Design a protein with these regions (language model features):
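ATP-binding N-terminal substructure of ATP-dependent carboxylate-amine bond-forming enzymes
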Residues: 1-106, 383-397
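Short amphipathic alpha-helical segments and helix-helix/interface helices
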Residues: 15-22, 118, 142, 178
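Short acidic-hydrophobic, aromatic-tinged amphipathic segments that line or gate anion-handling sites
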Residues: 50-57, 132-136, 166-169
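Glycine-rich phosphate-binding loop signature in dinucleotide/nucleotide-binding domains
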Residues: 69-76, 146-148, 182-184
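Conserved ATP-binding module of the ATP-grasp superfamily
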Residues: 127-131, 151-154, 163-199, 221-232, ...
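ATP-dependent carboxylate/phosphate-activation module, predominantly the ATP-grasp catalytic core
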Residues: 172, 191-257, 261, 268, ...
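Peripheral (often C-terminal) accessory segments that flank ATP-dependent C-N-forming ligase machineries
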Residues: 311-398
Length: 398
C-alpha cells in the first residue's frame, strides 16, 4: 500500500501516524516544504521517501511530487494530511489521481463551509444553531437577529477557531460589522448559544462505523480567550455520554464520512433553548474532518490508556483495529501566559502534580495566542481533581 502523507512534520506529533503506518507494512511517502534534515528523527525513520517542495501552497509542485511517487512506487492508495489547512488540496489531489479512499473535490464544500454543513445537519435531523449568510444583506441579518435575539455571532463561512469572529450585541454593532468587514459576503451569522463545547472525537472506518470514540470538553469561547488573553483549560472526559455518542454517529452518517479521524463539535446547553433543546442537551456546532488540534490526540491516549495513532493506522491498513481500551481517567490541560503573575510557582505545580503529569512544556509560538506559553497536562481520577488542578495552575497573585 502506498500512502502519500502531506505535511507529515506538522503538527510535530504526526510522526506517530507515519510510524504506525510503517509498522503495518505501509509505504509512507512524505511531501512537505521543510528541509529533510530538519525533520524529526522519528519521522525520517518512518518515511519510505520524502519529496520536498518549495511551498505546499503551490499545487503544481505538490502534484508533481505525487506523480513522482506514482511513477516510482505504483498506484497511490491514500493521500492525506489530517490537517484542516490542507483538506481542500488533499481532495483535489485525490480527484486528480483517482484515489477513492477519501473525500474528493465534489464533496469538499460540505466539510469546509459552515453554510453547507447546515444542510447535512438538517438531513440527519440534528439540532443546530440557526444561521443566515451575511451576503443576504444588513437588513436581512437584522431581521434574523430580531427573530433569534441578540447577541449573534458572525464568523467566516470557511475557517476554524476564533480567527475573524465577531460577537454582535445590537443594531449598532451590526452596522459596524458591515462598515468595517470588507469581505462580509464570505461570513455567516448565527444565533448565540451558551454552554460547554464538547467534541465527539472518533476514528471512522470505510463503512462509516466508529472504531473509537471519545469526548473532549472545551472552554465556551476560544474567541474570548484569544481577544481577552485569558488562561486556557480543557479536558478529555473519561466517558462519553450516550446522547453525544448517538448524535456523533448520526452526524457521521448524515455527512457520509468514512476513512477518517473526525472532530465534531457540539454545544451542551447550559439552559433550555426553544427550538433546540433542554439544559444538558447537545446541539451541533460544526464538523472538522481531522483530529482535534494541539496535543489533544495525545491527551485522548492518556485518558483512555490507548493509542489513537495506532487505531487510525490500523484502519488505513486493515480496515479495523483490535486495540482495547485500558484504564479510564480524565486528562486535563491548563496553560499560563507569561504576562501574568501566578499564585503558585512553576516548581510548586510540578511538586504537587509531578507524579500525575504526562506533559509539561513551552507552547510553540504559533499556538500561544489561544493556548498560552506554558502548558501542563495531567491524568486525574475525578472531576473534582480536574477543577482543583485548573485552579492551582490559573490562580493569580492579587
Amino acid at each position: 500500500m502506498n500512502f502519500v502523507f502531506i505535511s507529515p512534520h506538522f503538527p510535530y506529533t504526526y510522526w506517530q501516524f507515519c510510524n504506525h503506518l510503517k509498522q503495518n507494512g505501509v509505504q509512507v511517502l512524505g511531501i512537505a516544504d521543510a528541509p529533510y534534515d530538519s525533520l524529526p528523527n522519528e519521522l525520517r525513520e518512518s518515511l519510505t521517501e520524502y519529496y520536498r517542495v518549495e511551498s505546499l501552497k503551490n499545487y503544481d509542485e505538490v502534484y508533481r511530487g505525487v506523480a513522482y511517487f506514482a511513477f516510482r512506487y505504483g498506484r497511490i492508495d491514500w493521500i492525506e494530511s489530517n490537517n484542516e489547512y490542507w483538506l481542500e488540496q488533499d481532495a483535489r489531489l485525490r480527484t486528480d489521481f483517482n484515489v477513492s479512499t477519501g473525500i474528493r473535490s465534489d464533496r469538499i464544500r460540505s466539510i469546509k463551509e459552515k453554510s453547507e454543513m447546515k444542510k447535512y445537519y438538517a438531513q440527519g435531523g440534528i439540532p443546530t444553531a440557526r444561521q443566515i449568510r451575511a451576503a443576504e444583506g444588513q437588513e436581512a441579518v437584522r431581521q434574523f437577529a430580531l427573530q433569534v435575539g441578540y447577541p449573534i455571532i458572525a464568523k467566516p463561512d470557511v475557517g476554524v477557531g476564533a480567527s475573524g469572529t465577531y460577537k454582535i450585541e445590537d443594531d449598532r454593532g451590526l452596522q459596524r460589522f458591515y462598515d468595517e468587514v470588507g469581505d462580509y459576503k464570505n461570513y455567516v451569522a448565527e444565533e448565540f448559544i451558551t454552554g460547554e463545547i464538547c467534541s465527539y472525537d472518533a476514528i471512522i472506518d470505510a463503512n462509516g462505523n466508529a472504531l473509537f470514540e471519545s469526548m473532549t470538553v472545551w472552554p465556551p469561547s476560544i474567541m474570548d480567550i484569544v481577544n481577552l488573553r485569558l488562561d486556557l483549560s480543557y479536558y478529555v472526559d473519561r466517558e462519553i455520554p450516550e446522547s453525544l455518542r448517538e448524535l456523533g454517529r448520526r452526524t457521521v452518517k448524515a455527512f457520509g464520512i468514512w476513512n477518517r479521524f473526525v472532530h465534531l463539535e457540539f454545544f451542551r446547553l447550559d439552559s433550555d433553548r426553544e427550538g433546540l433543546g433542554r439544559k444538558g442537551d447537545f446541539v451541533a456546532l460544526e464538523v472538522n474532518m481531522r483530529p482535534a488540534g494541539g496535543y489533544t490526540p495525545d491527551m485522548i491516549n492518556y485518558a483512555h490508556s490507548i493509542d489513537v495513532y495506532k487505531i487510525w493506522a490500523d484502519m488505513v491498513a486493515f480496515g479495523e483495529s483490535q486495540t482495547q481500551l485500558g484504564v479510564q481517567l480524565y486528562c486535563a490541560f491548563a496553560s499560563r501566559r507569561d504576562i501574568y503573575q501566578y499564585l503558585h510557582s512553576h516548581e510548586e505545580v510540578l511538586a504537587r502534580y509531578g507524579d500525575r503529569m504526562v506533559m509539561c512544556e513551552r507552547m510553540p509560538e504559533l499556538f500561544s495566542a489561544a493556548m498560552g506559553q506554558q502548558m501542563y497536562t495531567v491524568r486525574l481520577q475525578t472531576m473534582e481533581e480536574v477543577n482543583d488542578f485548573v485552579s492551582f495552575v490559573h490562580d493569580k497573585k492579587l
